[in-house]
């Protein structure tokens, strides 16, 4: 019987790139709480002792950006100089400009050539869903995120007091080539920052027994499963001291772990007029509802936009041979049941709210948080009925 391997990774909230994402989205939320129509493109850089805030923001909100950045870094867990990054001691620089009026006229309703709210940029976005996990996400990325959430939980509640904020997980999964189903877990890689006093042996045992085994399905762990725990042997220096972190540098972790294509646009720090974010969320919503409706067991959708134009320039769907109806009919159903114009997406998913901070670590998809409207399957029944199934 033929098999193939597939791998995805996740990183913790203390990973430097994720620190940057969370600061950017915390600033976005602070602005949207006061000014839901604000235009925000908030970028963040973190390095040893330094946090740089830059980008374009047009808003009436009065926000203490430095305070928001420090509070976010502190909540993540970088609150002392011995960790190499201290929320209270690091320098924070603020370098925001306003949104270009040339861009604004294409996005503002009633301005520009298309009087509807146009897309904030050109670009292509993908959405994906499959039936491998309860939240209709690919197996490897779903469980990589769960491993990182478990690491954070045990760090914060003190059960493993030697854990530090920075960590990464990677899962290699064996699939059956004929059925496309997960057969077993081949390799688990987990690297976590730690207190220098803990031994590699003690750390490895605790990570396997208290982080990995409680999270992963036991029937998929075999005697052949390989565990690679802190394979360099030491991970004391981490976070922004170990590596410079930037907003938008973990786009595959944020989405489908490489199981679906990515259009290239990052999410964090961007208000919902940016289709990089809002249309990617809408695509996930569409794909998840198609799978939840039983119209396919695997669904990938691509949309594209032109700056200043409201209607998508293209919509395509691939169900990889699992569809109950043709892809042409699926596209027609999508056009009938989902408004994929920028303003339609914002209204459909209620996106003008301060809901983004929670999305900036552990994945934007596959988490059924009440704020994550794009994870609802409320269109599944109507799609199924319209398809005649």
Swiss-Prot record:
Pfam families: S-AdoMet_synt_C (PF02773), S-AdoMet_synt_M (PF02772), S-AdoMet_synt_N (PF00438). K(+) binds at residue 43. Keywords: ATP-binding, Cytoplasm, Magnesium, Metal-binding, Nucleotide-binding, One-carbon metabolism, Potassium, Transferase. The keyword Metal-binding applies. Binds 2 divalent ions per subunit. Mg(2+) binds at residue 17. It catalyses: L-methionine + ATP + H2O = S-adenosyl-L-methionine + phosphate + diphosphate. Belongs to the AdoMet synthase family. Catalyzes the formation of S-adenosylmethionine (AdoMet) from methionine and ATP. The overall synthetic reaction is composed of two sequential steps, AdoMet formation and the subsequent tripolyphosphate hydrolysis which occurs prior to release of AdoMet from the enzyme. Homotetramer; dimer of dimers. This is S-adenosylmethionine synthase. It comes from Neisseria gonorrhoeae (strain ATCC 700825 / FA 1090).
């Amino acid at each position: 019987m033929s098999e193939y391997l597939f791998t995805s990774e996740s990183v913790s909230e203390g990973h430097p790139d994720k620190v940057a994402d969370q600061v950017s989205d915390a600033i976005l939320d602070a602005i949207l709480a006061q000014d839901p129509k604000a235009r925000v493109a908030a970028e963040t850089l973190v390095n040893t002792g330094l946090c740089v805030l830059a980008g374009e923001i047009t808003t009436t909100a009065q926000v203490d950006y430095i305070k928001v950045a420090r509070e976010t870094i502190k909540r993540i867990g970088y609150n002392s100089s011995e960790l190499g990054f201290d929320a209270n001691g690091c320098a924070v620089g603020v370098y925001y400009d306003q949104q270009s009026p040339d861009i604004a006229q294409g996005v503002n309703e009633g301005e520009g050539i298309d009087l509807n709210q146009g897309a904030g940029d050109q670009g292509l976005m993908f959405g994906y869903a499959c039936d491998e996990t309860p939240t209709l996400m690919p197996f490897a990325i779903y469980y990589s995120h769960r491993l990182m959430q478990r690491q954070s939980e045990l760090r914060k509640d003190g059960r493993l007091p030697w854990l530090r904020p920075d960590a990464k997980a990677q899962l290699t999964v064996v699939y059956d080539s004929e059925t496309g189903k997960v057969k077993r877990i081949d390799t688990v890689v987990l690297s976590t920052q730690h207190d220098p006093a803990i031994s590699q042996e003690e750390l490895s045992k605790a990570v396997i027994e208290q982080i990995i085994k409680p999270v992963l399905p036991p029937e998929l762990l075999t005697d052949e499963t390989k565990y690679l725990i802190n394979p360099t042997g030491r991970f004391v220096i981490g976070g922004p001291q170990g590596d410079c972190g930037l907003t938008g540098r973990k786009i595959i972790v944020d989405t489908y772990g490489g199981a679906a294509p990515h259009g290239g646009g990052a999410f964090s720090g961007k208000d919902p007029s940016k289709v990089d974010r809002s249309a990617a969320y809408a695509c996930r919503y569409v794909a998840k509802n198609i799978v939840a409706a039983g119209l396919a067991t695997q669904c990938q959708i691509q949309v594209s936009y032109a700056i200043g134009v409201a209607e998508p320039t293209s919509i395509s769907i691939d169900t990889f041979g699992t569809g109950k109806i043709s892809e042409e009919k699926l596209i027609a159903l999508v056009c009938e049941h989902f408004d994929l114009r920028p303003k339609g997406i914002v209204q459909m998913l209620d996106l003008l709210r301060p809901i983004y901070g929670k999305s900036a670590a552990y994945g934007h998809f596959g988490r059924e948080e009440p704020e994550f409207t794009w994870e609802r399957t409320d269109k599944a029944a109507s799609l199924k009925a319209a398809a005649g199934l």
